[in-house]
């Protein structure tokens, strides 16, 4: 399991360096990934959601107020989920906002059409 966490951390570092997917949004994937980094262990291994994960989700929700920023956040989250691969528990990831008391305007899922997020 330590190898999985090392791989997840390496992927996260690459995603932070990669930056934004689109140029219409002020929000970068680096910012999204930084805010959600504390959630990786939970979505891969389960257990208790770390308080830092909830803080990151709340912060990300507060900075992603415009439609382009929300769409960008959605795209970044999907990219991170794809990078984590089969080790990702989609149900855990989808449940984080509610567990953290955050209402986001879209479902956390790789099947979400980010273009429809408002």
Curated annotation (Swiss-Prot):
Pfam families: Tryp_alpha_amyl. Disulfide bonds join 29-76, 39-53, 54-100, 74-114. One of its GO terms (biological process) is cell wall organization. Residues 1-25 form the signal peptide. The keyword Disulfide bond applies. It comes from the Eukaryota. One of its GO terms (molecular function) is calmodulin binding. GO terms for cellular component: apoplast; chloroplast thylakoid; Golgi apparatus; plant-type cell wall; plasma membrane; secretory vesicle. Keywords: Cell wall, Cell wall biogenesis/degradation, Disulfide bond, Lipid-binding, Secreted, Signal, Transport. It is found in: Secreted, Cell wall. Expressed primarily in epidermal cells. Belongs to the plant LTP family. Plant non-specific lipid-transfer proteins transfer phospholipids as well as galactolipids across membranes. May play a role in wax or cutin deposition in the cell walls of expanding epidermal cells and certain secretory tissues. PANTHER family: NON-SPECIFIC LIPID-TRANSFER PROTEIN 2-RELATED (PTHR33076). This is Non-specific lipid-transfer protein 1. It comes from Arabidopsis thaliana. The lineage of its organism: Eukaryota, Viridiplantae, Streptophyta, Embryophyta, Tracheophyta. The gene is LTP1.
């Amino acid at each position: 399991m330590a190898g999985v966490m090392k791989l997840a951390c390496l992927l996260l570092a690459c995603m932070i360096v990669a930056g934004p997917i689109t140029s219409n949004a002020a929000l970068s994937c680096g910012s999204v990934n930084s805010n959600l980094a504390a959630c990786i262990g939970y979505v891969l291994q389960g257990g208790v959601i770390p308080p830092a994960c909830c803080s990151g989700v709340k912060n990300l929700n507060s900075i992603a107020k415009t439609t382009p920023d929300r769409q960008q956040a959605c795209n970044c989250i999907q990219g991170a989920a794809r990078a984590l691969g089969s080790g990702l528990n989609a149900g855990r990831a989808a449940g984080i906002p509610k567990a953290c008391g955050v209402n986001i305007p879209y479902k956390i899922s790789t099947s979400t059409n980010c273009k429809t997020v408002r």
